[in-house]
Swiss-Prot record:
InterPro entries: DNA_glyclase/AP_lyase_DNA-bd, DNA_glyclase_Znf_dom_DNA_BS, Formamido-pyr_DNA_Glyclase, FPG_cat, MutM-like_N-ter, Ribosomal_uS13-like_H2TH, Znf_DNA_glyclase/AP_lyase, Znf_FPG/IleRS. This is Formamidopyrimidine-DNA glycosylase. Monomer. Binds 1 zinc ion per subunit. The active site is at P2, E3, K59, R264. HAMAP family: Fapy_DNA_glycosyl. A zinc finger (FPG-type) spans 240-274. DNA binds at H93, R112, R155. SUPFAM superfamilies: Glucocorticoid receptor-like (DNA-binding domain) (SSF57716), N-terminal domain of MutM-like DNA repair proteins (SSF81624), S13-like H2TH domain (SSF46946). It catalyses: Hydrolysis of DNA containing ring-opened 7-methylguanine residues, releasing 2,6-diamino-4-hydroxy-5-(N-methyl)formamidopyrimidine; 2'-deoxyribonucleotide-(2'-deoxyribose 5'-phosphate)-2'-deoxyribonucleotide-DNA = a 3'-end 2'-deoxyribonucleotide-(2,3-dehydro-2,3-deoxyribose 5'-phosphate)-DNA + a 5'-end 5'-phospho-2'-deoxyribonucleoside-DNA + H(+). PANTHER family: FORMAMIDOPYRIMIDINE-DNA GLYCOSYLASE (PTHR22993:SF9). The gene is mutM. Belongs to the FPG family. It comes from Pelotomaculum thermopropionicum (strain DSM 13744 / JCM 10971 / SI). GO terms for molecular function: 8-oxo-7,8-dihydroguanine DNA N-glycosylase activity; class I DNA-(apurinic or apyrimidinic site) endonuclease activity; damaged DNA binding; zinc ion binding.
Amino acid sequence: MPELPEVETVRRTLQAKLPGLKITGVEVLLPKVIRSPELSEFKETIADKKILKVGRRGKYLLINLSEGYTLAVHLRMTGRLVYCAGQDPPARHTHVIFNLSNGCQLHFADMRQFGRIWLVPTDALDGLKGIKELGVEPLEELFTREFLKKELRRRHARIKPLLLDQTFIAGLGNIYADEALHRARINPERLATTLTPREIARLYRAIRDLLQEGIENRGTTVRDFIDGNGQAGNYQEFLQVYNREGKPCPRCGDKIAKKKVGGRSSYYCPTCQKVK
């Protein structure tokens, strides 16, 4: 699933292309992708809306439109939102095509069909269920070391599932959670309440640094991710543990292990990330 750095990379590529263009029409090839409003209203409402800005909240892309509307897009597991020349044939698994006033198109494709799109009044955006439940943005000022320390002290959960909880920290997923825990030398099964102040400080810095590094390298492409221009990311070349089972830990040389934690595959180093 695209995580914060990948969604931010898509946002930045589309922000460079879309503002000022109008959506002249939309072709919906898989109606279940559109969650609200009803399909005919969706098509009618979005027609001739001008694109003002491309934003992001957690893993949601937010395309602000004229007349007080916002197009919210969640890519889920394999979704893609790509700016295409009008003559480009749609890629396989393309489900929605937005026609633009410059003759180009915006294609939403999703092999696994889990991605979703909403068109809502901008002033009602915070009431959208998935968005209103989101936690703090980890690259913004509200996410401080003290905030993390306070929250971990009151949450009786294992650290890896907690980092994946979008109501706690918005945008973290399996890749960057595994990498952050490895960099901070914390086992994914540790209870959050047992982390020392020094470990919390390392984890805080690891989360911030890794997300920024991911953005600077245009995201991580393990299998499916491409940005708004159709280009793969580069950060997979720098991963230390994720998807590296059996390979040597870059820090100590022990073999990277894999196990299920909270129902999710977790990659870690048994030596650097010992259970305490």
